[in-house]
Amino acid sequence: MSNDQGSQFLRAPIVVVLGHVDAGKTTLLDKIRGTAVAKREPGTMTQHIGASFLPWKALEAVCGSLVSQIRAEVVIPGFLVIDTPGHEAFSNLRRRGGSIADIAILVVDVLRGLEQQTFESIDILRERKVPFIVAVNKIDKIPGWKSFPNTPFVESVKRQSEAAQLKLEELLSYIIQQFASLGFRSDRYDRIRDFTRVLALVPVSAVTGEGIPDLLLVLAGLAQRYLKGRLLASIAPGKGVILELKEEAGLGMTATLILYDGVIRRGDIVVTGGIEGAFSTRVRALLMPKPLDEMRSPEDRFLEVERIVAAAGVKLVAEGLEKAVPGAPLFVAVSEEEVGRLKQLVEEEISGVKFERDVVGVVVKADTLGTLEALVGYLKKQGIPIRVADIGPVVKRDVVQASMVKEKDPLYAAILAFNVKILPEAQDEAARHGIPVFQERIMYKLVENYQKWLQETRDAEVRKAFEKITPPAVVQILPGYVFRRRDPIIVGVRVVCGRIRSGVPLITKDGREIGEIMQIKEHDKVLDVVSEGAEVAISIRSKAIVGRQVKEGDYLYSNLSIEEINRLLEKYEKYLAENEKSYLRKLMRFKMGLSKEIEYP
C-alpha cells in the first residue's frame, strides 16, 4: 500500500432504489441518470460497473434555485447510485449487522399507495438499519394534473388547479396513514422541520421529471447532515461486497464489486466467500466502462485501471471467482499473513447466513448470500422454522434433509427455492418421497405459496380427523317407508341435520340406544355418506322393533359422548353448520342431565 494509507476523506453515499413492481423504480433511476447527463455540466455522470456516480456539480445544476435551501456547503462528492433496483440487489449490499447502502429511495405509486413489496422493502430497510426517503411517483397520472417537465415539485404544484391539488392531498393523506400504521411519522418533504423524526415524502414523476430536483436535494441534505460520520473513508486496504458474478468473453468469471471503503489495486490479494467457504485470490485486472464514444466494438467495453478508491463499482478479474457468491464480503489483504485472519472473518460472516441445524424445519435455497439472508429473515418473521439455509441449486441432499423432517412433521418437509434451479436427480427424489418444492423469483410469492400449501395441508389433515369422529346427525323415519321392522331394521329416512354414514350409532329422543347404521342405499345404489336433505333407506343392526321402541315419524339422533361433543365444538367448529352446532349443544344439555330429552328439532 502507498504511504498515504490511513488518510481520511468523505466518500459518496451509496444509494439504492426499492419499491413494489411497476411502481417506476427503473424509470426513476433512468430519469435521475439522464437528467444529470443532459445538463452536460463539468464533471457529469460517470458510469461505473453496477452503479452510476453522479457528481454533486452536475446535480447542483439540476436542482437549480432549490440548492439555496441547503444551508451549508455541500461537501459530499456526489452519489453512487446502484444501477439495479429492487430487493435482490439491495440484499446483496450486505455487511455484518447492516448494509453498505447508506440511504435508499423507496418508490411508491401515488395512486396505489403502499403495496406488498413496499412493505417487504420497509421491513428489510428497518432490519438493515438503512435510512430512506419516499419518492411518491406518477403524480402526472393524478386526474387534472398539468405537467411541467423537469420542474421542482414545489413550483409545479403551485401551477395546478385546486381540484388536482386536493386530489394530491387526498392521495398523500392515505399514504401518510399507511406509514402511521407501521409506526412512521411522515409528511410532504416541504412541510418537515426535523428530518430525523419525520419520513420525507417527495412527490415526483419519473416520466416528466417533475420533483426530481426536490428528490436529489432532500437526498443530498440528509446525506450531508446525518451521514457524514458514516461516509468517512480512508486510503486503507479496501472493503467491498460482491454484487453479482458474470462470465465475460476472454475474461472468464468476473465479479461486480461495490467498494465502500479504502482502495483496491491490480495485483492485490483479496479474500472473499464462496459456496465452499472463504478463499483468497489475486486481482488480475480492475475494469471500468469505457465512455461510449471510445468503444470500438461490443467486446471493447472496458478500460483497465490500476486502482479504485471508495465509493465505487468496479469489475474485478481474478482466478477462482466461479467459487464466489454474490453478497459475500471482499477484503484486501496487505500480506499473506493477514489472509488467515480475513478468511476467518469471512467464514464467521457467511456462517451467520448459511447453516444446517438438527431441527424440524424447511430447507431454503437461494441464489446469493444476500437473498438467502433476506429470505431467512422473512421466514423467521413468519414463524417458519428452518433446517437448512444454503446457496445454489436444489440437490439430492436437500431432498434427503426434507425427508428426515417428514418423519417428524410432514408440514415442514418442504424445499423453498428462490431464483435457483432444481437438479433433475433432486426432482426425481422429491417426487419419489412426496416432498413439495416451491420455486419462485419473487420472495413474498415464494413464502405465500408455501404458506398456502401449509394451510391447505393442515386443513386436509384436520378434515381427515374430523371425518373419523361420529358426525352430528338427525334423521326422521319416513311414514310408510318401513321395509323391515326387526334386526336388521330397514327404514326410509330423511336427513334433517348433518350427515350420516355407516357405523354411526343412533339413539331416540330420550336416549334409548337403537343401534348402528349398517348400510345406506338410494335406488339400490350403496352410498358411503349422505347429507342434510337426502332421503334414503338405511339398515340398522338393532334389538329394537319398529312399532314398539321406535315408530314411524320418530327422530333418531347420532350418539356422541360429551368428550366428542366438546372436541367438535372446540377444534372443528369451522367445519360445522349452524344447525349442527345447535344440535350438539342440545345433545350436550341432555347428556349432562339438564334436559329430559333431546330438544331438537
From Swiss-Prot:
Positions of region (G1): 19-26
Domain tr-type G: 10-227
GO molecular function, one term: translation initiation factor activity
SUPFAM superfamilies: Initiation factor IF2/eIF5b, domain 3, P-loop containing nucleoside triphosphate hydrolases, Translation proteins
Region (G5): 205-207
G2 as annotated region, ranges: 44-48
Region named G3: 83-86
Alphabetical list of CDD domains matching this protein: aeIF5B_II, IF2_aeIF5B_IV, IF2_eIF5B
Residues annotated to bind GTP: 19-26, 83-87, 137-140
Keyword GTP-binding carried by entry: yes
InterPro entries tied to this protein: EFTU-type, P-loop_NTPase, Small_GTP-bd, T_Tr_GTP-bd_dom, TF_aIF-2_arc, TIF_IF2, TIF_IF2_dom3, TIF_IF2_dom3_sf
Gene3D superfamilies: P-loop containing nucleotide triphosphate hydrolases (3.40.50.300), Translation factors (2.40.30.10), Translation initiation factor IF- 2, domain 3 (3.40.50.10050)
Keywords: GTP-binding, Initiation factor, Nucleotide-binding, Protein biosynthesis
Pfam families registered for this protein in UniProt: GTP_EFTU, GTP_EFTU_D4, IF-2
Gene Ontology cellular-component terms listed: cytoplasm
Region (G4) location: 137-140
Function: Function in general translation initiation by promoting the binding of the formylmethionine-tRNA to ribosomes. Seems to function along with eIF-2.
Family note: Belongs to the TRAFAC class translation factor GTPase superfamily. Classic translation factor GTPase family. IF-2 subfamily.
Name this polypeptide is given: Probable translation initiation factor IF-2
Organism per entry: Thermofilum pendens (strain DSM 2475 / Hrk 5)
Lineage, uppermost ranks: Archaea, Thermoproteota, Thermoprotei, Thermofilales, Thermofilaceae
